[in-house]
From Swiss-Prot:
Domain of life: Bacteria
Name of encoding gene: caiC
Enzyme Commission number(s) from the entry: 6.2.1.48
InterPro entries linked to this entry: AMP-bd_C (IPR025110), AMP-bd_C_sf (IPR045851), AMP-binding_CS (IPR020845), AMP-dep_synth/lig_dom (IPR000873), ANL_N_sf (IPR042099), CaiC (IPR023456)
NCBIfam families linked: PRK08008.1
Pfam families found in the cross-reference section: AMP-binding (PF00501), AMP-binding_C (PF13193)
Pathway: Amine and polyamine metabolism; carnitine metabolism
Name the record gives this protein: Crotonobetaine/carnitine--CoA ligase
Keyword Transcription (UniProt): no
Amino acid sequence: MDIIGGQHLRQMWDDLADVYGHKTALICESSGGVVNRYSYLELNQEINRTANLFYTLGIRKGNKVALHLDNCPEFIFCWFGLAKIGAIMVPINARLLREESEWILQNSQACLLVTSAQFYPMYQQIQQEDATQLRHICLTDVALPADDGVSSFTQLKNQQPATLCYAPPLSTDDTAEILFTSGTTSRPKGVVITHYNLRFAGYYSAWQCALRDDDVYMTVMPAFHIDCQCTAAMAAFSAGATFVLVEKYSARAFWGQAQKYRATITECIPMMIRTLMVQPPSANDRQHRLREVMFYLNLSEQEKDAFCERFGVRLLTSYGMTETIVGIIGDRPSDKRRWPSIGRAGFCYEAEIRDDHNRPLPAGEIGEICIKGVPGKTIFKEYFLNPKATAKVLEADGWLHTGDTGYRDEEGFFYFVDRRCNMIKRGGENVSCVELENIIATHPKIQDIVVVGIKDSIRDEAIKAFVVLNEGETLSEEEFFRFCEQNMAKFKVPSYLEIRKDLPRNCSGKIIRKNLK
């Protein structure tokens, strides 16, 4: 089923400007409280100016341009401005340091970078060492160092006309973006995303939460992440809704922002839900218009019930990853929801549970979650310049191996168990890290938790728990292990406990387990 036709991203924005004109398209709130608003017409003009800026700097179809930015209007301008001239965006996680950022520059072949003053010093060194193809840097800040190969993004953009000057032939099969995976277990891989992928993501995600043009979709997820781009931004724009992009998440400010912008849809990860729950109760907890909270793994039933009861919301579960572009398994609009199920396969997808020999398993049996889509259309096209890694996860007929374990029931509802790499082998038993974390998270003194497997000469692996306590709390090893023994099988009880002030997380809130082993 082809629901895109020939509508690439350039055509999308020209159409949106014509149809929605002066309707608010984008609201950006900075960490300092500065708010910028753009209508669909104004946003398309800013995108055109940005496309013209890149063209004047020598960027042509197929060239790669890296963005190292926090959530800001310039990210949106660049994303679609590059797409309009057939160039390719390479977003870089704004939390990455020099070595990681340089690695992405080298492996993406980016020749130009858009960033801000806070990140400039490390890129200045990278540019001077000449170890990458980077030849020019645009800074979004007003203050500009007097260095060769550095320009003011805003100054150059404002000099450009509001109509597009360079419009090469485009196809929906053209690459729009190379998004490097978070790399929680290994070096990140460049996920190739096409114009078709992004257009499909918009329609699909809008369907998933029944988005209308009078909706307001607010997100605090980072713009360099697939969730913000494909579940939130593309959905909102495709439906003609208003997209609210908040620069950084604050548990104290979140509900006030939802009220101020009259948000009807938002998205949350477990870290957000847990930090929102530890805020002091307020009479304004339910003073919002949210009808759906898009939710991504993983939360215990007790935590879910407490959150929904306190804030008067319901969670719409969505399961996916960078390679699937969208939440390919999830709750459906107006359909029943079956917690803790992650939902059912969405339209245009097939889903199966397979064993270690790649054979489909019946209902109730645990195996790998596999998804069938169309590469370059409903799932990613390939890993950039990495055919070996592509072949490892993507079969010729479109079946994608997720690396996640789960099972399904007789009605087609799927249940997530864990990442395969997060299964601990203990004395012949398979132990799910997620299962243990959900149990331990119910302890009233514990705010955050992760368990990992560590080498054990007798039992293959031992289990170690890292916990963050609620403010002012203390927890003895005796109390912790007694709680575990009362709530889980003996072979699942951790052998070690470490109390920490925080846990290492990536941009999407996922624990970076390799930093704890």
